[in-house]
């Protein structure tokens, strides 16, 4: 084993660990960094305490632990053990624990000092999983505040050294070049006329015919693996084994894919991107890369995760090709045009930028951090995703202001997805706890295909679900209890209230309580049910509606009876313009879904008035009797707020008036029981009621409704929201006025629209004095000819004004 490439850098690595709290190790897959190096570190006297090795994938974690134990001629659970969701294999003598990401986070939360741990290794860090980024942030916080003696080793096949070194400038970087042989990289775009699975199978079978050795085939997901395997079966010889490789397989099937083919046989390993770097698959000389991967992208607008199939990055293509050169010169066939491959993104996007962050936010709040920016991140969590996470935690009752509520603390202590944690802590009896635990186990590991009825799935007893249920019940300190299908609906409703769904039409389409659409196959037996709770949804790329993967049919009346907190009651009004009456209704709703509508028989005046106010808010202020006088009063108040801000003017914009209807309109509604009566309300007086006597006097003085011109005429001022106030007056009535009139304590000049004797505009000005001295001469000249019997003096500023339209003889 000492011939492994990473052995060459072991002395340098041990020295670095002795001298620095954080060390970066870059070593390609197959160098021995996961399956040999941890045992050497275990023997190093400079590391005091246990070693925790984080593997981001469960499949890799179990296989790494198995391999390390075999090297010691032991079984997992002795010196080397592992911990993952629903599976623990550690003993009293375990000194090296291989754990998955969520497990490491739980260990840190329960014991922030990581007592008894000397070294934490983050393996495959280049994958930049959400939990790995969180683990790094927490570990750096632990080192800084609690354990300056804790060592941290960050290992990767393609380490992003520049960014990590910026974040950890004092950390030594150890590089193992690895051992690889030349790989010939070929490119072949798939024919457009052929189905994907068939085209991939044809290309793979052709490579097997032309070349010797076992082959690793990269595919986007399990569905493609199964379909391509079926296509390949009829295209290969009896000396070729087909070995799928993905997380849901049994340990024996996974080992069959990882170990060398039997003597005289070849194998084709059909794998997802887990085989890029997480596992060393022995005996591979050929690689076929479909150049695609399936990734999850969270949509903060809908709260749903969308699975998309996309082209892999150039870094992933390089990693995939490298798997062909571990033992001897190899060949990699990329099923993509070379120019397309060269245009691919350089690196894959980190999960933290495209994931649901509700679990991360709950972990940070449990850690005592209400501002994620206070932690150390390679990429800051997106603000919009954090906002969506906060909304969900609030809906689940996990927040008290900016901190975790008592319920939120119980949820965080469980370490589950926030929705499942909320469901688990809501259990009030042992039977409810047992039911919630089984539901959580099913939703964590849902069946890949088959029945979409959660009630039917719940009736099954799969060993993995039973094992996980028992683990969750232990965390809840519950012994006993029987899982009861009659308890599923109320438990689900508390955690998935926004995913209660009502059928719309007969084609399997539903509307969710959050307003989103969802769908079942039209022939799915569930589609005959009016109401569902759909805890498992997947947002596809082809349809705006989410696909319902698992749902429970419910009787809505029974659900409302058992969970009254789900329902919001609202009294609304319908306007019957033809009859001039109001019809009041009471609606029971769950989110945006209407459960029941019933008329309000003989509502009291208070109920009717409230319904009318709700109706005004629904339809807008335009339903009220806005006379010209009322509209001008409102505009005067709006302008007063801008021009005289030192006084406490009431807010009269639409939003404010609608929000305060009870304050200014309701007191004037006594005896109003109909739409006709509502339209007869004096809105002018209602608005003036917003002002006390002193403010009314100030408004009338500083922003008057009328202006008295030199002739004594009281002429209405026209106020505008976005334009200066205007006064339309015949020019002769302004003679003798030397300066432009102003309002608002002289701060705002009136716009004068000076009219001809025929009431046609002659001039618009905000500086009357300048007009008399300047442009008036041109007006005078023209008007004398057009209106010779009217007064057009040479000195209008000092001429007596007149209402008369003719000269005296």
Give the label of every model feature segment:
Residues 1-423, 483, 538, 722-724:
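P-loop NTPase motor module signature
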Residues 399, 432-517, 530-706, 745-809:
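Acidic, serine/threonine- and proline-rich low-complexity intrinsically disordered segments
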Residues 686-748:
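C-terminal accessory/binding modules appended to enzymatic or scaffolding proteins
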Residues 520-521, 585, 717-718:
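Short capping micro-motif at the N-terminus of alpha-helices
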Residues 111-126, 136, 290-294, 303, ...:
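Extended active-site and interfacial segments that coordinate phosphate-rich ligands
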Residues 121-122, 250, 254, 426-447, ...:
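Charge-dense polyanion-binding interfaces
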Residues 181, 518, 714-716:
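Short, isolated positions in well-ordered beta-strands
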């Amino acid at each position: 084993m000492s011939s492994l490439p990473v052995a060459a850098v072991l002395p340098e690595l041990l020295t670095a660990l002795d001298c620095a709290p954080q060390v970066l190790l870059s070593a390609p897959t197959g160098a021995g960094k996961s399956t040999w190096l941890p045992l050497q570190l275990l023997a190093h006297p400079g590391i005091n305490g246990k070693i925790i090795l984080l593997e981001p994938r469960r499949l890799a974690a179990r296989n790494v632990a198995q391999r390390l134990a075999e090297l010691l001629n032991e079984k997992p659970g002795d010196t080397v053990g592992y911990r993952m969701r629903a599976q623990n294999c550690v003993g009293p003598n375990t000194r090296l624990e291989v754990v998955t990401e969520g497990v490491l986070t739980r260990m840190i939360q329960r014991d922030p000092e990581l007592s008894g741990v000397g070294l934490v290794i983050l393996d495959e860090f280049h994958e930049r999983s959400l939990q790995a980024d969180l683990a790094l942030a927490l570990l750096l916080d632990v080192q800084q505040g609690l354990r300056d003696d804790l060592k941290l080793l960050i290992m990767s096949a393609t380490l992003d050294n520049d960014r990590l070194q910026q974040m950890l400038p004092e950390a030594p970087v150890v590089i193992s070049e690895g051992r690889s042989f030349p790989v010939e990289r070929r490119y072949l775009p798939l024919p457009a006329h052929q189905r994907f699975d068939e085209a991939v199978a044809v290309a793979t079978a052709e490579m097997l015919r032309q070349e010797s050795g076992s082959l690793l085939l990269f595919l986007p997901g399990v569905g493609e693996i199964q379909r391509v395997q079926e296509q390949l079966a009829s295209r290969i010889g009896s000396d070729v084994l087909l070995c799928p490789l993905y997380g849901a397989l049994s340990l024996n099937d996974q080992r069959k894919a990882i170990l060398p083919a039997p003597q005289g046989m070849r194998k084709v390993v059909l794998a997802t991107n887990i085989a890029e770097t997480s596992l060393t698959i022995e005996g591979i000389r050929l690689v076929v890369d479909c150049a695609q991967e399936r990734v999850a992208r969270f949509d903060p607008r809908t709260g749903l995760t969308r699975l998309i199939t996309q082209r892999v990055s150039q870094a992933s293509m390089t990693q995939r090709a490298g798997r062909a050169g571990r033992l001897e010169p190899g060949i990699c066939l990329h099923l993509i045009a070379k120019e397309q491959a060269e245009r691919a993104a350089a690196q894959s996007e980190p999960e933290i930028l495209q994931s649901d962050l509700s679990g991360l936010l709950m972990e940070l709040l449990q850690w005592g951090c209400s501002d994620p920016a206070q932690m150390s991140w390679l990429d800051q969590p997106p603000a919009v995703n954090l906002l969506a996470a906060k909304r969900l935690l609030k809906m689940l009752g996990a927040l008290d202001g900016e901190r975790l509520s008592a319920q939120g603390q119980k949820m965080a202590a469980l370490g589950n997805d926030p929705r499942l944690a909320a469901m688990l802590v809501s259990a009030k009896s042992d039977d409810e706890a047992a039911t919630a635990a089984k539901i959580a186990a099913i939703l964590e590991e849902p069946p890949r295909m088959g029945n979409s009825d959660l009630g039917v799935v719940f009736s099954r007893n799969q060993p993995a679900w039973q094992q996980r249920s028992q683990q969750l019940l232990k965390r809840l300190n519950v012994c006993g209890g029987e899982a009861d299908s009659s308890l599923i609906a109320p438990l689900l409703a508390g955690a998935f209230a926004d995913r209660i769904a009502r059928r719309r039409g007969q084609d399997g389409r539903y509307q969710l309580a959050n307003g989103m659409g969802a769908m079942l196959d039209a022939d799915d037996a569930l589609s005959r049910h009016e109401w569902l709770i759909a805890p498992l949804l997947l947002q596809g790329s082809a349809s705006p509606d989410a696909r319902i993967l698992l749902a429970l049919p419910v009787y809505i009346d029974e659900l409302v009876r058992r969970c009254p907190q789900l329902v919001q009651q609202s009294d609304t009004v319908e306007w019957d313009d033809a009859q001039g009456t109001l019809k009041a209704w009471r609606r029971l709703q769950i989110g945006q879904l209407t459960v029941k509508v019933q008329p309000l028989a003989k509502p009291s005046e208070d109920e009717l008035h409230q319904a009318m106010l709700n109706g005004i808010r629904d339809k807008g202020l335009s339903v009220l009797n806005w006379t010209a006088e009322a509209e001008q009063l409102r505009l005067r108040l709006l302008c007063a707020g801008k021009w005289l801000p030192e006084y406490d003017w009431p807010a009269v914009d639409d939003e404010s008036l609608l929000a305060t209807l009870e304050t200014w309109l309701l007191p004037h509604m006594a005896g109003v029981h109909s739409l006709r009566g509502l339209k007869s309300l004096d809105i002018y007086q209602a608005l003036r009621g917003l002002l006390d006597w002193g403010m009314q006097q100030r408004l009338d003085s500083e922003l008057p409704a009328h202006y008295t011109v030199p002739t004594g005429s009281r002429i209405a001022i026209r106020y505008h929201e976005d334009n200066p106030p205007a006064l339309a007056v015949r020019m002769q009535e302004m003679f003798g006025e030397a300066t432009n009139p102003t309002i608002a304590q002289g701060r705002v000049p009136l716009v004068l629209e000076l009219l001809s004797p025929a009431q046609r505009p002659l001039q618009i000005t905000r500086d009357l004095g300048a007009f008399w001295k300047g442009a008036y001469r041109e007006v005078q000249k023209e008007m004398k000819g057009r209106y010779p019997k009217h007064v057009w003096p040479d000195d209008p500023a000092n001429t007596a004004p007149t209402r008369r339209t003719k000269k005296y003889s």
